[in-house]
Amino acid sequence: MMEPALADGLTEGARGLGLELTDSQTGLLLRYADLIARWGRVYNLTALREPNELLTHHLLDSLAAVPPLRRQTGGAAVRVLDAGSGAGLPGLVFAIVCPELDVTCVDTVGKKAAFIQQAAAELDLRNVQARHARVERLAGPPFDVIASRAFASLADFTALTRHALAPGGVWMALKARDVEREAAALDADIEMFHVEP
């Protein structure tokens, strides 16, 4: 069970990112973090186990991408792919905070995809699908936004997912370092139009 102080930390951290979470969203995010903490060792979801680390390194890190995501989608009900989702980050966070989105989380590790599906069911997130697949072999309708966090280099990320991107769609890579170097390695037809500090 997550500590009450974490709710305050989540609310304040989100506010610092320009997000006003509802009580319901805060509760769902904390329950999700609790699921990661409880099942993390069993499913090898993440190296982080401490509640404060889950808050800062996973929840708030994923929430930081919500304002640019909202600017891009304009609040429309679009399809989002989370490539290499792991524990469902950032896909489940997007689904909680932006319920209008149709989010598909894909991971090559079956137990991680199973965790995402179970977490979505326990949190009653009807806008989430989990797929156990290699993203480069993913079939089906294209996605308006393809996101990744700690997945691959920008060049590999775009190459592996290009077939799944809808015309006019965008890639959203949550990257902490090497952005300029990786951007220089992108195919010439890929335009990098925004970098969030």
What function would you assign to each model-found segment?
Residues 1-75, 81, 111-112, 118-128:
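Class I SAM-dependent transferase core
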Residues 13, 26, 97, 185-189:
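Alpha-helical structural signal in soluble globular domains
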Residues 36, 94, 174-175:
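Residue-level signal for inorganic ion chemistry
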Residues 72-76, 138-141:
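Glycine-rich phosphate-binding loop signature in dinucleotide/nucleotide-binding domains
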Residues 82-86:
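Conserved S-adenosyl-L-methionine
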Residues 87-100:
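Conserved SAM-binding loop of SAM-dependent methyltransferases across substrates and taxa
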Residues 100-197:
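S-adenosylmethionine
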